[in-house]
A protein has these predicted regions:
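C-terminal lobe and adjacent flexible extensions of AdoMet/dcAdoMet transferase-like proteins
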Residues: 213-222
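Class I SAM-dependent methyltransferase SAM/SAH-binding core
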Residues: 55-113
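C-terminal alpha-helical "lid/dimerization" subdomain adjacent to the S-adenosyl-L-methionine
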Residues: 20, 28-29, 34, 154-213
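Short glycine-centered segments of the SAM/dcSAM-binding site in methyltransferase folds
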Residues: 55, 150-152
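A short SAM/SAH-binding and catalytic strip from SAM-dependent methyltransferases
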Residues: 123-135
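A short acidic, Gly/Pro-enriched loop at the edge of an enzyme's catalytic core
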Residues: 112-123
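A short glycine-rich, Lys/Arg-flanked "PGG" loop and its adjoining helix->strand segment in the class I
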Residues: 137-149
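Conserved class I S-adenosyl-L-methionine
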Residues: 1-50, 65-69
Length: 222
């Protein structure tokens, strides 16, 4: 099953899974992962000030289930949301339209070939993205390319080796259904990758199997 088809089949339940708002998705989140995705999302989004006034890329923007309320407050920002899935984009667009958010532009695209010039964005957000990107090294390179020197890269993604039940479920279910795409980083591998790009300007911590990070691009490329 391809990644596109997997997410198409999941669309009706995606937001329920991510937010744990149904009894079964609450059990999935709190018993299997032992992590509250809502709390993780809040922590990541708090890294971005409401009065941020620069250019921002959100990749993958997904359905905007976590970001819509935040973006409603960020009226001075110029936000671009990119996702490979047109179904995700349709849901996000409907959500932004209902919230009367006009300063977010949505585009279908591939994180490994971002349709933007180098040093274009002041901030890049990537929540729950890198564990679904097939070519993770290229994705990191593209994010680094389009980010301005001094710009911020923040977000979260799954890392292996922190919780056995979660790792088993990823290998046996999510990877096989195309909902996650291996290979996956360990915490050490993820930290090494971020530091290879951003040097000492890296802050990370993990909430069990979820890595939360904030990086600042050095003023001079390396």
């Amino acid at each position: 099953m391809t990644q596109k088809n997997s997410y198409s089949r999941l669309m009706n339940r995606y937001d329920d899974v991510m937010t744990g708002r149904k009894w079964w998705s609450w059990l999935y989140m709190h018993c299997l992962w032992k992590t509250d995705d809502n709390a993780v999302a809040r922590e990541v989004l708090e890294m971005i000030p409401d009065n941020f006034s620069g250019t921002m890329l959100d990749v993958p923007v997904g359905t905007a289930v976590f970001t819509c309320d935040k973006y409603r407050q960020m009226t001075n920002a110029e936000i671009t949301g990119v996702d490979y899935s047109r179904e995700m984009l349709d849901i996000a667009r409907s959500r932004f339209d209902k919230a009367r958010i006009k300063h977010v532009t949505l585009r279908q695209g591939d994180v490994c070939d971002l349709p933007f010039p180098s040093k274009h964005f002041d901030l890049v957000l990537s929540m729950n993205g890198f564990h679904v990107f097939p070519e993770k090294e290229r994705a990191f390179a593209e994010v680094f390319r389009v980010l301005n020197p001094g710009g911020t890269f923040c977000g979260c993604f799954y890392i292996k080796g922190e919780r056995r039940p979660a790792d088993w479920f990823v290998r046996k279910v999510l990877d096989k259904r195309g909902l996650f795409i291996p290979p996956h980083y360990t915490r050490r591998q993820a930290e090494d990758k971020l530091r290879s790009l951003f040097g000492a300007n890296v802050e990370i911590r993990n909430e069990r199997s979820i890595l939360i990070f904030k990086c600042v691009k050095p003023d001079a490329d390396h």
